[in-house]
């Protein structure tokens, strides 16, 4: 869960929601572990139990009022199960400044683009802040990585989700390059004010070691297509994504471990996947 609390605002939205699944393939002779990442669009219109219909990015904040029932992550998990048939058991919630600090702690990351990226985000003064990258390899510090992962007004959620998955892979590659796993306890301490999780430090180290041992073809990603989801405008004017075809949606969820590796998927900078 990627949260974006604003200064002076006690509420927040989780504009980044990723489901990470691991298939250890322990029962398959010669099986190799596979990791799958599903990006859930922030504007997906869902039923929020106990609240009504709304964007899925509202659910984490709404659920935080239900601490005895697991809070926001538990409510998001319930919605993911109801909507996608995906059951989640653990969570990590990180604020945007946590991403900035992590990338800077690694000394920056490199992403490769097959065409220029020209993105926008509102600046709060009636205009836009711009973020431009040329085609080819681009080095990103923490501030640039945040823009790469969050700007979307020149494209849409589909493009941003694709970029977010590529950024996760770039972070993994950089962590391996500098042998960062032994420094995870120090990173945990340094970033502790920017994230919450029900994982222990030992859990994180164990998952990091698993990730470091995987080849590129063992890490897959799903960004939902326009076969599954469609843009619409609600009666109140809200622009949201609704499920166009449940069968197509579930087929894309089921393809999680069969899709192209994240490392082979350049960001869909033009917008929608088809």
Give the location of each predicted region.
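Non-catalytic, solvent-exposed segments at the cell envelope interface
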Residues: 1-274
């Amino acid at each position: 869960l990627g949260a974006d609390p604003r200064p002076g605002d006690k509420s927040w939205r989780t504009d980044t929601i990723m489901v990470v699944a691991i298939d250890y393939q322990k029962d398959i002779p010669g099986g190799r572990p596979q990791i799958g990442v599903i990006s859930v669009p922030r504007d997906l219109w869902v039923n929020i139990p106990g609240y009504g219909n709304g964007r899925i990015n509202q659910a984490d904040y709404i659920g935080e009022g239900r601490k005895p029932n697991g809070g926001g992550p538990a409510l998001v998990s319930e919605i993911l199960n109801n909507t996608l048939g995906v059951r989640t058991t653990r969570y990590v919630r990180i604020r945007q400044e946590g991403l900035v600090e992590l990338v800077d702690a690694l000394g920056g990351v490199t992403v490769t683009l097959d065409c220029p990226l020209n993105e926008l985000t509102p600046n709060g003064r009636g205009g836009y802040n711009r973020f431009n990258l040329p085609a080819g390899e681009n080095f990103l510090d923490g501030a640039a990585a945040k823009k790469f992962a969050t700007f979307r007004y020149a494209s849409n959620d589909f493009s941003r989700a694709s970029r977010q998955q590529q950024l996760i892979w770039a972070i993994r590659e950089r962590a391996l390059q500098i042998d960062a796993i032994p420094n995870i306890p120090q990173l945990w301490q340094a970033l502790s004010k920017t994230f919450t999780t029900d994982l222990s430090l030992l859990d994180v180290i164990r998952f990091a070691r698993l990730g470091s041992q995987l080849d590129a073809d063992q890490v897959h990603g799903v960004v939902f297509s326009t076969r599954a989801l469609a843009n619409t405008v609600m009666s109140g004017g809200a622009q949201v994504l609704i499920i166009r075809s449940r069968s197509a949606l579930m087929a894309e969820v089921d393809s999680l471990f069969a899709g192209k590796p994240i490392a082979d998927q350049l960001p869909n900078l033009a917008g929608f996947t088809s």
